[in-house]
Amino acid sequence: MAESQEFAELWERNLISTQEAGTCWELINDEYLPSSFDPNIFDNVLTEQPQPSTSPPTASVPVATDYPGEHGFKLGFPQSGTAKSVTCTYSSDLNKLFCQLAKTCPVQMVVNVAPPQGSVIRATAIYKKSEHVAEVVRRCPHHERTPDGDGLAPAAHLIRVEGNSRALYREDDVNSRHSVVVPYEVPQLGSEFTTVLYNFMCNSSCMGGMNRRPILTIISLETHDGQLLGRRSFEVRVCACPGRDRKTEESNFRKDQETKTLDKIPSANKRSLTKDSTSSVPRPEGSKKAKLSGSSDEEIYTLQVRGKERYEMLKKINDSLELSDVVPPSEMDRYRQKLLTKGKKKDGQTPEPKRGKKLMVKDEKSDSD
């Protein structure tokens, strides 16, 4: 009891009630404060308000035109052919990437001037045609329900980043577009670019997804707060055979370019080009053979033939061609006329006599007999 009473007395001596204390400044001895100290110094201090975000407002329709910016931002792709075995190939003529579903697509990021520290690279997919550009590009329901990946990327996102644990998958608050962001990395020594490995997780032909609608992938270089530093874009087709599709589309593209070139040529020049092209086509007439005889191609070729019968046939053809190089066209025409006359006689078409006399046929008796 004695100890508890002593503790109560100690508590009463050290406890300061709010009525007695008043303001906290009364607890401080005046001898420790300078004479010019103002106890109301903190009365006019305002509480700092949160600043609005410096990120630019997101456009409802993203711009896909190239913008290298002050840093000279551009993209590169590894060289690849059109073999059927390739899983990813890029066409510079079409500015189009052909790839298989969920296969690695390396894209090289190149800058002339290093961007600020903390810059990021953002990849966004949009539809190419104006009638579809307002829609969000997302995976089809079938692939969206398919379990794949490491679980870091949302199931609806078309574009994913491979081999980078710092990738962040975003969905815009304004237009709900999907994007994936990775930090910009300085190229390693001896290299002029940084490579990002992308995957496209749905086929272009999938119903309920892209549904054969062409898409563009926009790669943008941004600061950490979203300010645009550079932008590039390219078309993407996700298909089963990238090499075959690239070869077909490049062939069609070249044909279209040739047609457009002919359309730009005036009609008079076009007719002259047509005449020149038709005159260069080989014809079996004698005049053309005369031109062939004057050809400067004197090289001799050897052809191996199996079987004597074929050899005799090809030999006759060769002898005829050699003869046509020597015989003038007029003699050739005269020879053809003789062949036609002989052919008519063999068919029994005998000429009628000029003065009405009956022409006797073999084994036919005359009237006198």
From Swiss-Prot:
Positions of Zn(2+) binding: 140, 143, 202, 206
Pfam short name (any one): P53_tetramer
One BP annotation, GO: epithelium development
Motif (Bipartite nuclear localization signal): 270-289
Name this polypeptide is given: Cellular tumor antigen p53
Role, per record: Multifunctional transcription factor that induces cell cycle arrest, DNA repair or apoptosis upon binding to its target DNA sequence. Acts as a tumor suppressor in many tumor types; induces growth arrest or apoptosis depending on the physiological circumstances and cell type. Negatively regulates cell division by controlling expression of a set of genes required for this process. One of the activated genes is an inhibitor of cyclin-dependent kinases. Apoptosis induction seems to be mediated either by stimulation of BAX and FAS antigen expression, or by repression of Bcl-2 expression.
Residue numbers spanned by region Transcription activation (acidic): 1-28
Compositionally biased residues, Polar residues: 269-281
Cellular compartments per GO CC: cytoplasm; mitochondrion; nucleus
Region (Oligomerization): 298-329
PROSITE patterns associated with the record: P53
Stretch list, region Basic (repression of DNA-binding): 342-365
